[in-house]
Amino acid sequence: MAVPTGSANLFLRPLILAVLSFLLLSSFVSSVEWLDIDSSDLKALQVIETELGVNSQRSSASDVNPCGRRGVFCERRHSATTGEYVLRVTRLVYRSRSLTGTISPVIGMLSELKELTLSNNQLVNAVPVDILSCKQLEVLDLRKNRFSGQIPGNFSSLSRLRILDLSSNKLSGNLNFLKNLRNLENLSVANNLFSGKIPEQIVSFHNLRFFDFSGNRYLEGPAPVMSSIKLQTSPHQTRHILAETPTSSPTNKPNNSTTSKAPKGAPKPGKLKKKKKKSKKKKVAAWILGFVVGAIGGTISGFVFSVLFKLIIQAIRGSEKPPGPSIFSPLIKKAEDLAFLENEEALASLEIIGRGGCGEVFKAELPGSNGKIIAVKKVIQPPKDADELTDEDSKFLNKKMRQIRSEINTVGHIRHRNLLPLLAHVSRPECHYLVYEYMEKGSLQDILTDVQAGNQELMWPARHKIALGIAAGLEYLHMDHNPRIIHRDLKPANVLLDDDMEARISDFGLAKAMPDAVTHITTSHVAGTVGYIAPEFYQTHKFTDKCDIYSFGVILGILVIGKLPSDEFFQHTDEMSLIKWMRNIITSENPSLAIDPKLMDQGFDEQMLLVLKIACYCTLDDPKQRPNSKDVRTMLSQIKH
């Protein structure tokens, strides 16, 4: 049956364009989903998931895009081989999946892997030595499984590890593999079969906020420094990629079996026969065209609907475009001055002046400010796995983000000569950028380290000035600001010094504003840093202003003694801690033994002993007996040179 040429051309042109558009769109989507994924990662992932037992839980439909699967997260990386960008597997999160397999040695092929979370399964056998090839690994969470055997001896080569949880398994051997993991923040090896002594090096891990060695009956001796800590980690939250929404493809099925009859008494066709045949052909062509166009239109509509549906879900789950920057200082004239924080290449070119649990601190020149230098602190805020988000979770996260912005807004408007001013805040889905004034002298911890190494001098008048400045800043936060702000992590690393050696307390208000950020607190909402935490916190888990006073007392002791709580010196004393050693020396026949030898015989011994007594007063075990920040500032101000 022929279709009239004119009509066919009229209808087929838009049809051909629609088909071509659909095919181009399909090929584009396919290239995004497949062509940019690193082939070696794909092969490794296939083996890893098979041996873990993940594949048995997955339908064939989920194999379309490995980076869109539940638990598999990828990031763009530049390939040195091809010179192009590829997707690399950076996180594998298979918690609570009832897995009963093993970790494949192929895990070592994932050279960009930053997180491996397999908690709460029934996985068995040993942790393969091949995991040592994952040099980028930062999070290893294997708790609540049935792993056995010993941890590989060269485990310390995973120097980037921040979170290590091996608890509730059947692992054995000694703990020497922990010796050089100096970037650890959260550590738990509880409820295993480990034996031997706990490595003394752990006390020098400055980033360590939390550790748990309990439940290992064969371990010998106490835990270093803070042997009473018995905390439990909570699941480490990770970044996510929203799962693909299935595309629907409705089709239309027109009824083309209709017939017509001539009215009774109507004339016979005669000369109208050819016209009727042409009319019939047009109707058939229209029916066929309608069927094809309807089918293709339905398919395209279904595809578009699925994309829109996905975008709506992302918006509901808090993945909407982040708000613009909050600016708190006239130094930053417009939001565009902070646009470089959205540029990965621009950030990569900045000088890194510090690294910690929260991420990195960059030194940058503020655009349009005639050379004004700023410090940009990146605070990691990993979002929850999209597959685990419920509607209630989404509402909670949205409320939480509003609360974070509100808290930071409060901090941004605080101004005091002994508090480091926050200039701006830029929020991103997975991190926060906090912009501060740049302090060229660095932190008190940096200076004390240089002094101890003999590279710098810090005489007593300068130390007293620093102590008085910290006390004044605390007094403002505790007594003068409404609402009261408790620092929660006061330590030398959070005290910066300006050009006049005036103390500036940093990071105040952040521990409350961002409790899930991996900054100065653990994921179980435990605040502070080992060596500076008030003893009552381990019983009450409540942080008060008297906890800040305790931390300040430790800093006063450091300024006089010249040693940090993590110094090996205290490990060779009977007291095993700075505070206990300080108390015993100050009540001994010769309290001057507590004074830093670099400060002796300069005529300030009496003043330093007075400050040491104030330090003991601030670190009393009973928080009710400790002074408040105003009393401390008053006592220090009465000590004259």
Swiss-Prot record:
Which sequence ranges are listed under topological domain Extracellular?
32-284
Outcome of substituting E575K:
In sobir1-2; suppresses BIR1 (bir1-1) disruption phenotype
LRR repeat segments: 112-133, 136-159, 160-182, 183-205, 207-228
Record note on modification: Autophosphorylated on Ser, Thr and Tyr residues.
The record ties this protein, via InterPro entries, to: Kinase-like_dom_sf, Leu-rich_rpt, LRR_dom_sf, Plant_LRR-RLKs, Prot_kinase_dom, Ser/Thr_kinase_AS
Which sites are catalytic? D489
Q: Where are the transmembrane segments?
A: 285-305
Would you name any one GO CC term? Answer: plasma membrane
Task: Please cite one Gene Ontology biological process associated with this protein.
Answer: defense response
Q: Which domain of life is it from?
A: Eukaryota
Q: Where does the record say this protein resides?
A: Cell membrane
> Which GO terms fall under molecular function for this chain's record?
ATP binding; protein serine kinase activity; protein serine/threonine kinase activity; protein tyrosine kinase activity; transmembrane receptor protein tyrosine kinase activity
Pfam families recorded:
LRR_1, LRR_8, Pkinase
| Spans within the Cytoplasmic topological domain | 306-641
Q: Which sites bind ATP? A: I353, G354, R355, G356, G357, C358, G359, E360, V361, K377
Could you tell me which SUPFAM superfamilies the record lists for this protein?
L domain-like (SSF52058), Protein kinase-like (PK-like) (SSF56112)
State how it assembles: Interacts with CST. Interacts with RLP23. Component of a trimeric complex composed of RLP23, SOBIR1 and BAK1. BAK1 is recruited into a pre-formed RLP23-SOBIR1 complex in a ligand-dependent manner.
Family assignment from sequence similarity: Belongs to the protein kinase superfamily. Ser/Thr protein kinase family.
What is the protein name stated in its UniProt record? Leucine-rich repeat receptor-like serine/threonine/tyrosine-protein kinase SOBIR1
